[in-house]
Amino acid sequence: MNLLKHIFLEDDYDAYEGTLDPASFFRINKQEEIIASTVCEIGWEYSKSFGNAYICTSFLCFHSDDFKTRFTFPLAAVRKLERENSDNDTFTFDLSNFHSQIIHLRFKGTRQQSEFFCDRLVRQLHASLEDASSVGLFLLSLASERVCFSESANSQEIESIDLGLGSQFGYPIASSNTNGLINENNSKSWIQYLKKNGANFNLIQTPNFQKLVQSGIPNNLRADIWETCSGSLFPRWKSKGFYAKNIDSVINNRCEYSEEIEKDLTRSLPDYPAYQSPTGINTLRRILLFYSETNKEVGYCQAMNIVLAALLVYCTEEQAYFLFSQLCEFYIPGYYAKIIHGLLLDLTVFEYVLEHTLPHLYQKIIELDMDLKLITINWFFSLFIKDFRLDYAFRILDCLFVNGPRVLFQVALALFKVNAQGILNATDDSSVMKVFRQCFDHINQGTAADEKMAALGSRSSMCTLPQLFAVAFEYFDFITDSFVSAKRKEFKSSVLYSLRCFTKRSHLRSVYQTTLLSNTDLDLVYDAFINAIGENNICHGDVLEQKIDFNGFERLVDCAAPPLSVIREPLHYQRSKRKLFTRLYIWMKDGDSTETSLTFKRIIHGLERLKADIALHSEILCFQLYDLKRDGTLRTEEVVELSESLILLCCYEGDEKDEERLTVISEFLKSCFSGCQDRRSFQITMEDFQAIVDTTGLHATLEFFLKKLIDGLLGKLNAS
């Protein structure tokens, strides 16, 4: 009995199970629509399972009530669907797949639910017929298909399949004294399981499958199992050679991350022979360049090289590309983003979990005034690849791809638990780090070293990988993907807020000392600027030189213009807004019409000028704003545009002053054009403009107008 499960403060953890949306649970494209679902019993090869079935756009999915049995079948891989004759109203079907396996489906919902489910299943099967022709040829490229189901396959055909760099440079080999060694019997067990329960497109995962995974996956099947369980096999099949078609053109283009990637190539698994040779280095370079160029919102981040270098040991470039993409979308979203927000979020979730599952260890870390993230950041960032010897690291990746992101939390918790005594005896942070270093050393040395340490009486260091797995997956089995997902959602806003504050402080640290704006105003304009360009486009170098185009500037300042109480803004209103924003944009660039973008530095400088001169020189600022030719005169169209802008920002406040301002603006226009015979040749100088402003009392309206512009640039109106 797992007592921890019952004293865990979050004792309603069972309520989280099933809260994960089906697309995330089955790791299928978020664009897949869940068309129908029903309660269902499935049977195959003397096995049965009861749970829920789902029809998606391209898949038939199932999970048992305890979530320990599941499958995700592409509808295109279904060969036949036949209804069994039944004396009652039970809906029972036999489904045949490409491996000639028969899956019995018995729908247990209401008659109406079952009829609807069957109707939609037949419809989607018909819709998938176009893809069915490509399934057979694609499956023949998979090692699992050749090993388990191809009658004509021989050793030469199997060896001809590309099994990653390991087929050329060797796979990591477990030492002979290591428990859980992947031997011939293990390979036979895998082949027997796959023949009985299906492989690749037709794999049914059961509790026995989980046990096999923990014992290790054979080298020739590892890439297939990773792809199938992660869901990356399906987008790779549907891509129809996307990687091969585009790799050459993409890597021949200049990549902004080339220098960073080049520096990290030789640091990626430096002890593995492939990355001491041009073949391995070139392979890794190609996929890193391709991924960063085809996922520009992510780009390149350190630790990508380590994870992809590991995947390439067993995978082709194409397999590794889709597998890593799936990893980043469904397992560790945001880990390798520009601000690694996903990594920081998971470290926060782990801190919460440690506090509530092993509170005595968490309290010890607090007493030592130690930042928990210093211990765990490399574990999560590199998926433990840097901490365990390579064959063990792949065993953890096996569990991760099959069971989901909870594995990272379970293994990390297990490391704390098996080292509990050493942590409690620690006197400072360095001694805690030493405890973990020694633990990794002993695990990586294998069983013989562990037995020697146990003989010396060191119980806390006595641990093998199978023992660590037992603690992780049995003692902490209540940590589920649904639980992790729920906690990610719970902490996401606070983590992002803290991250934004930290990023802002680091970006503006030097600017605070030099700007004429107050710290509050600088914070506001920074927030408005970042909202306009989007957080994914932040330049983490010199933020002052970060650029924004006119469309982004329009989003930034649009909040200065009050929304009208109509469904659609009148066309003249939209034109007036765009003209105003164009004037302000060019004025912010100091009239430089050749420059296509505006830097954050120039926005700050423009705001400084506006705020400094608004009270005493509002008429001068407004004149300069519309004197784009910089010849000291305003022409007819410029005076009219100024008047339209004043009406736009000053006469839609919804109070009694709207009418007063409109009257003053009308008087201003009359005074400007009184006595003018030909408006095409009309010009007004700065001095004449100031005189008319004084005569008509327009100064207060100009000042109000500029304040509204400033509020728009600072984002104050959006904030309110």
Swiss-Prot record:
Domain of life: Eukaryota
Disulfide bridge map: none
GO biological process: vesicle-mediated transport
Main location: cytoplasm
Keywords: Cytoplasm, GTPase activation, Nucleus
InterPro entries referenced in this protein's UniProt entry, alphabetically: EF-hand-dom_pair, GRAM, PH-like_dom_sf, Rab-GAP-TBC_dom, Rab-GAP_TBC_sf, Rab_GAP_TBC_domain
Compartments (UniProt record): Cytoplasm; Nucleus
Domain Rab-GAP TBC: 216-404
PROSITE patterns: TBC_RABGAP (PS50086)
GO CC terms: cytosol; nucleus
PANTHER family: RAB GTPASE-ACTIVATING PROTEIN 1-LIKE, TBC1 DOMAIN FAMILY MEMBER 2B
Function: Stimulates specifically the GTPase activity of ypt2 and ryh1. Inactivates ryh1 during recycling between the endosome and the Golgi compartments.
Protein name: GTPase-activating protein gyp2
